[in-house]
Amino acid sequence: MAPLQTTYALTQGRFIVGMIPDMRTPGQDRSLNVEPAAGIGFGKSVGQGTAERQIKAIATGQATAFLGVTVLDTTQLQDSYPQYATARVRTKGPVVVTVSGAVTPGAAAYVVPATGAFSATASGNTLVGKFETAAADGGMAVLNLT
């Protein structure tokens, strides 16, 4: 039988997408139901779904207002919330997200309505908070939702 893992990192990664990064005063979270059949990953921007208390990921072709960010749930069997699951959605406070373009601490954070990506670029995007850590394009940063 071949080994499953043959190399090990010296340390664990700093962040996991969707994680709550620290123990400061709690943020504000809502429990909402996942609408899409494909489910919704952790650390994703979400908006209002078709029905009350439903959410869907903000993505190309969806004209939905930003509600919050899905929070990591280690009880899920995959790296996402499946359809009909109750998702924890952060509406205020810190959460780790993947960024589009480089970001710096203190920079205003925006969600891109066409893609749902988080960016420091203001043009045509929706202000959602501030970045608390730096990250390169495609990296993970702490976003403090306001």
Regions found by a protein language model. Give the residues of each.
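Surface-exposed, low-hydrophobicity beta-strand/loop segments enriched in small/polar/acidic residues
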Residues: M1-T146
